[in-house]
Amino acid sequence: MRRNLTPFFFLLPALTLMVPFVIYPVFKTIYLSFFLGDKFVGLENYKNVLLSPDIVNLERFPTKSPPWGALIHNIVWIAIHLPTTIFLGLGFALLLRKKEVKGSSIIKSIIFLGMVIPMVVGGLIIRFLFEEGAGVIPAFFKLIGIEKLAITWTAYPQTALFSVILGSIWIWTGFSMLMYSAGLASIPKDYYEAALIDGANKFQIFRFVIWPLLRPITVVIVAMTLLWDLKIFDIVYVATGGGPGGASMVLALQMWDYFARSLNYNYAAVVAVLLTALTFIPALWLIKRRG
């Protein structure tokens, strides 16, 4: 009996920390989501939050400029950010995998820099890059004669959301590049040599040799990117604050807004529960695929 209980004694320190800091807050958040003040309202809070233009604004989406609602902003973020970072990460990994490429290590370090710096610093960099008169992006559009985009992107509803999405692509591309670089390094050279002997060209080698072997890594990258896109907070908070007028508001920031600005703890709890449920989808998908 004592031997059977030994593992539980080793778990006690972790459980002692998890109960007050993880388990209790989770159940307390779920509890608050069903109340309005001290009154039990069931699913009424969920109905009000999901129908709120703060979360989904179908009157403006997709015919008008943002704000479209925090949930739609997250979906747009995923639709742009996920495929772009995978494509760029894979592209850079393929181009820089050979040691013969001059400066490949330096280029990789620059690309991966976005993952190393704190997200708060990343948000400040994004705000600076898209600032009129100082940023690289407005200066570029002014140089090529597109004056409409030579503005402070974070200050206008039409461009604020896309400025933080584009900035986050630089931040996250380093992660996918690093993962794909590790995957490419693990592929034996014999596979390439066998394909060349069989008369395969570069595209066929990528399609039938490289890509199938990189699929498990791609699953991990997709799941991790989805989780990051859903819980994104800090760079948006620093770069735009969710503005102007909620044009770049995302779910995690909307949750904070309900909690800290509106002092509506019940609505904040609802968004927290919804956000947790959404993050479970890629997490469970990853576990299933890896299993």
From Swiss-Prot:
Probably part of a binding-protein-dependent transport system PH1036/38/39. Probably responsible for the translocation of the substrate across the membrane. The keyword Transmembrane applies. Residues 71-286 form the ABC transmembrane type-1 domain. Gene3D superfamilies: MetI-like. Keywords: Cell membrane, Membrane, Transmembrane, Transmembrane helix, Transport. It is a multi-pass membrane protein. GO terms for cellular component: plasma membrane. GO terms for biological process: transmembrane transport. It comes from Pyrococcus horikoshii (strain ATCC 700860 / DSM 12428 / JCM 9974 / NBRC 100139 / OT-3). PROSITE patterns: ABC_TM1 (PS50928). PANTHER family: BLR7065 PROTEIN (PTHR43005), SPERMIDINE_PUTRESCINE TRANSPORT SYSTEM PERMEASE PROTEIN (PTHR43005:SF1). Coiled coil: none annotated. Belongs to the binding-protein-dependent transport system permease family. MalFG subfamily. The keyword Transmembrane helix applies. It is found in: Cell membrane. Its main location: membrane. The chain crosses the membrane at residues 7-27, 75-95, 106-126, 133-153, 160-180, 208-228, 232-252, 267-287. This is Probable ABC transporter permease protein PH1038. It comes from the Archaea.
